[in-house]
């Protein structure tokens, strides 16, 4: 990480100097977040990075989450955590899902292992699929927020009772709360934007007149985290178990080496019945799990947490407050995210991951508009992109739930489930999301220059070596949750950064041409370094180059002292780790890869396509 750019400092470099908040209004904020779940905290952590944005986050609960709820962390979410600076801590604490085993009954009705497969294919991500309590993920986000200059912390015990628009004023959304910790006290917050991350029973969604639409599978399931003794051989593997007559069981080993989570199929519900009507107990869950695992034993010593739920797939028709006929014409002011706008079964491990991805998509867009870097139409892309993703998730979850609960006859269903699981492993890893062409994602005319960086999909990292200090690192780890766009300039095979080479020509254009993106941002009064981060990757042996000879754009002066930033130039690594080989980058031509602040590839262009670079950003950056 970088610090000292504004002068020598001591102490923890992750803790930013606190702002003087004496002039800040307690009742008028830029962004109000309702709900402290994964979606709300992802958004709050991202917005806390911007000293010029005021954020207020509230929750109806009395304090931070302690136990239960989601625990599966997809590879893509781990990549996102790296942008916030805590992916390595998750790796250290979490259970790593390395393999998945499948069990089904034999002719005598006893379960037996039918297959054991690798959970995540090689090279899919530099991070593993992990399991860690949602409460710990909350802890990490809360720490990021508290370490920010705002020292941002949630206000708990706040129940939303009213949300309305106040007309054409700066803080046009007014929210009223009951203060549950103080008798007869209410609190009113005026905000430019409100984001409802308040779960499946969202009051923000209700205030917008939106509904979760879909249906229930009328299937009752139980879930429990247990400490138990068993002679079942795969208890420390992720297991999908389908019994002859007692339903299905999904085993997810938990962090810490001893605890396991069990998702237990119970019974079908009547059309007018709900999970709460069955009065399910933890003893009933244990008994059903024992029946499914037979002839293996299960001796539960402690139940850490349990719940019963009904499978359903539901999604909102809109993720913001703009009516269908006004979309693109009217600025959205209120958004919903996470379970507030889509619900599904937990067995594919997508809930927390998709919720966090919702607000990671929204956060940088809000910041860009609030800071004057982009006009408001950028905000409309949140609904366009994430609503489509939610619809896709619902279809996937419906198929997964159907196959997992299907009645067994000749083994064909079990085999189909195994094939489906293997086929969709990339989806469950979170790396199959592809955003459609839009204001911020191109149509891919030059995709052939780097086929391993698919436009509209996440920037698939690869290792490189930093020129200045020979440090190996993953290229995507330079993309932090700071709201900046990235331009990665991949040099052609002859480029050494000398005058006349592609990198030098690109640098000269950016710095000298008054119409370049760099100089247009300066003309508009914007701090270039707050908007774009430009880096270079050369194909030469790093030992044959000197960073001080690189074009000026790639060794810029930065910070209050005007110090040189030596960390923007990289070289390839010989052998199988070569980024040009791993991502199929055209070695002869090189290219420019433009990456969005949420780590998705927006455009790929020839290295000399200066006008196209300008045109891409002119389409949505503020004039």
Report the location of each language-model feature.
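Extreme N-terminal leader/targeting segments of oxidoreductases
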Residues: 1-31, 46-53, 329
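Core beta-strand elements of the Rossmann-like FAD/NAD(P) dinucleotide-binding domain
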Residues: 27-29, 182-193, 197, 330
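Conserved mid-domain beta->alpha element of the FAD-binding
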Residues: 36-44, 141, 196, 303, ...
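Glycine-rich FAD pyrophosphate-binding loop
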Residues: 48-71
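Active-site-adjacent segment of FAD-dependent monooxygenases/related oxidoreductases
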Residues: 66-146, 394
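Conserved FAD-binding catalytic core of PHBH/FMO-like flavoproteins
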Residues: 143, 147, 193-311
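A conserved beta-strand/loop element that lines the FAD pocket in flavoprotein oxidoreductases
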Residues: 148-160, 298
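A conserved short coil-to-beta-strand element within the FAD-binding core of flavoproteins
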Residues: 156-173
